[in-house]
Amino acid sequence: MSVVNRRIAVYPGTFDPITNGHIDLVSRAAPLFESIVVGVAQSPSKGPSLPLQQRVALAREALCQHENVQVIGFDTLLAHFVRHVGAGVLLRGLRAVSDFEYEFQMASMNRHLIPEVETLFLTPAEQHSFISSSLVREIARLGGDVSGFAPAAVVAALRQNL
């Protein structure tokens, strides 16, 4: 087992794009940890609409007010990334009961791959509980207003890329 630091958390995701729900979760988790690493996954199997570098830049801009948060893109197995940064906690968000089955399965798999790391689930603030990146992308793709769901820079990037 690797040496891990339970004061360091990794919040992984595709963040395609980062939303106000993601930002809320990081903002509420930031005081709980010495450091949070937002790991932006390449995720080619998901066919992201925004390139990795742009997703990283948008997340950095959205989270820049938190001194203990860093944003790093990665294209490896999550378990390898977590070990690389020395984190002892995987941070995940649960919006609804429908998220639980998938997240439970992922947490169980990660427990086998990185048993020294704990998974911690946080729920979003109620006003963000329905927001998902895929819904934000779809609304933007169809010409809808997503300014209430994502930062202005994300809204502009979606308009340019979709």
From Swiss-Prot:
Its EC number is 2.7.7.3. It is found in: Cytoplasm. Pathway: Cofactor biosynthesis; coenzyme A biosynthesis; CoA from (R)-pantothenate: step 4/5. It is an enzyme of class 2 (transferase). Keywords: ATP-binding, Coenzyme A biosynthesis, Cytoplasm, Magnesium, Nucleotide-binding, Nucleotidyltransferase, Transferase. This is Phosphopantetheine adenylyltransferase. Its main location: cytoplasm. Belongs to the bacterial CoaD family. GO terms for molecular function: ATP binding; pantetheine-phosphate adenylyltransferase activity. Its cofactor is Mg(2+). GO terms for biological process: coenzyme A biosynthetic process. It catalyses: (R)-4'-phosphopantetheine + ATP + H(+) = 3'-dephospho-CoA + diphosphate. It comes from the Bacteria. Substrate binds at T14, K46, L78, R92. Homohexamer. ATP binds at T14, F15, H22, G93, L94, R95, E103, H128, S129, F130, I131, S132, S133, S134. The keyword Nucleotidyltransferase applies. The record marks H22 as: Transition state stabilizer. GO terms for cellular component: cytoplasm. Reversibly transfers an adenylyl group from ATP to 4'-phosphopantetheine, yielding dephospho-CoA (dPCoA) and pyrophosphate. CDD domains: PPAT. InterPro entries: Cyt_trans-like, PPAT, Rossmann-like_a/b/a_fold.
